[in-house]
Amino acid sequence: MATALKKNRKKRGHVSAGHGRIGKHRKHPGGRGNAGGMHHHRILFDKYHPGYFGKVGMRYFHKLRNKFFCPIVNLDKLWSLVPEDVKAKSSKDNVPLIDVTQHGFFKVLGKGHLPENKPFVVKAKLISKTAEKKIKEAGGAVVLTA
């Protein structure tokens, strides 16, 4: 009865079992770990880990992260910040005030459209030109805070 043997069982009894005569399947022929990344393993490092070696640009040593902290909100999300009861009461004469800093945003950007015939006053630390233009075109106003 013939049985299909695995490769390593087939090789048993043949001196070095397919692993050669000198190295005999020993130790670390290519070096350990990431050895040779700039030399004999360079092709693999470049192919599978591009950018692993080398430097880019300059580091900002004493960067104050809070100085650059500026969470943003787009125009199309502004109306969703208004509570439902305030939305119901709003009219041309009684427009809602949206203070974006109370919702955790500092800057208003101009992506998207505002709802038709629903002007409102936006209070923010920063605002882009396009956002300001769209809010004013819709009949609203912008208040900048410190």
From Swiss-Prot:
Name of the protein this chain belongs to: Large ribosomal subunit protein uL15y
Entry keyword annotation includes Ion transport: no
Family: Belongs to the universal ribosomal protein uL15 family.
Example of a GO cellular component annotation carried by this entry: nucleolus
Signal peptide: none
UniProt GO MF annotations: mRNA binding; structural constituent of ribosome
Record-level GO BP terms: flower development; inflorescence development; post-embryonic development; translation
Keyword Ribosomal protein annotated: yes
HAMAP family for the chain: Ribosomal_uL15 (MF_01341)
InterPro entries: Ribosomal_uL15, Ribosomal_uL15/eL18, Ribosomal_uL15/eL18_sf, Ribosomal_uL15_CS
Comp. bias intervals (Basic residues): 1-14, 21-30
Provenance organism: Arabidopsis thaliana
Key words, A-Z: Ribonucleoprotein, Ribosomal protein
Segments of this protein annotated with the region Disordered: 1-38
